[in-house]
């Protein structure tokens, strides 16, 4: 298991576990153009998120299609949904976004040792 530290504030950290299977599922969800557009729109919206109707208007996506794509993003943990009165709000789970980015970049530029390199060194 891979562990990524997420900074909540200057003095608070906690660990989110991330593995290749989880990361692949999240990247697969973002690999669809409509879901990527939804996600980027929600990132722009910030912590308050957007109501589903506003997402639909902004992206000109049919309601049933939008519902399907939002459900996929929520299933993989990238988007949170909640009800406020009669409206459903969607927002990005920024801790999970940071965990995914951390997973992708954790070992950046640390070098790679291939089997042949190890044998040559021996």
What are these regions (language model features)?
Residues 1-22, 40-45, 94-122:
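Amphipathic alpha-helical dimerization/coiled-coil segments
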Residues 17, 21-62, 84, 88-96:
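N-terminal helix-turn-helix DNA-binding core of bacterial DNA-binding proteins
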Residues 25, 75-76:
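A generic local structural motif
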Residues 57, 74-75:
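Alpha-helical residues within the helix-turn-helix
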Residues 62, 67-69:
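Short coil turns linking two alpha-helices in DNA-binding domains
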């Amino acid at each position: 298991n891979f562990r990524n530290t997420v900074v909540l504030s200057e003095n608070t950290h906690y660990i989110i576990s991330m593995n290749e299977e989880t990361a692949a599922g999240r990247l697969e969800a973002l690999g669809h153009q409509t879901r990527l557009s939804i996600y980027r729109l929600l990132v722009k919206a910030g912590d308050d998120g957007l109501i589903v109707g506003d997402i639909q208007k902004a992206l000109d996506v049919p309601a049933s299609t939008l519902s399907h794509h939002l459900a996929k993003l929520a299933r993989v943990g990238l988007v949170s949904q909640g009800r406020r009165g009669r409206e459903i709000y969607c927002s990005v789970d920024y801790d999970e976004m940071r965990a995914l980015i951390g997973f992708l970049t954790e070992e950046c530029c640390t070098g790679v040792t291939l089997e042949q390199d190890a044998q040559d060194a021996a």
